[in-house]
Design a protein with these regions (language model features):
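N-terminal accessory scaffold of Fe(II)-dependent oxygenases
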Residues: 1-101, 109-140
Length: 140
């Protein structure tokens, strides 16, 4: 049973991932280069979402860096002296509960905090070019 939850299934161009989280586990702020559909199957997860035009305020690691696509800011303890644009950053927050589905468009930046033991599955499905100009301003 558990093996089916943690393996990837490849069907045409769609890939399904299932992830488990424990309380306080964090996925650092980053963007994906494709559309992402996320369903929470159990537990609670907090997502902080920002429009791609906010990448200029996020001190993103550059293309080619091992952490490219990720923010250099520690969002759990941001330092506005080191990262002054942090204070300009605008975003939205959602607390996902079991059965919730979240759609992340291409390049939307997200920071994820597990609020308790939880599990989710997601699929990435192609990309859109709607936010290409926004993300290009940050060198991507």
């Amino acid at each position: 049973m558990y093996k089916a939850l943690i393996t990837c299934v490849y069907t045409n161009s769609y890939t399904y991932y299932c992830r488990f989280g424990m309380r306080s586990v964090i996925a650092e702020a980053h963007f994906d280069g494709s559309r992402n559909f996320i369903v929470l199957l159990g537990g609670l997860r907090r997502y902080i979402l920002t429009h791609p035009d906010q990448c200029v305020n996020m001190h993103m690691y550059p293309r080619g860096h091992p952490s490219g696509r990720h923010s250099a800011i520690d969002w759990s303890k941001p330092d506005p002296v080191e990262f002054p644009n942090w204070l300009k950053l605008r975003g939205n927050e959602v607390i996902m509960q079991p059965g919730d589905l979240l759609y992340l468009p291409t390049y939307w930046i997200h920071y994820i905090i597990s609020l308790n033991v939880n599990y989710q599955c997601n699929t990435r499905s192609g990309r859109t070019s709607h936010y290409d100009e926004d993300i290009k301003k940050c060198g991507f």
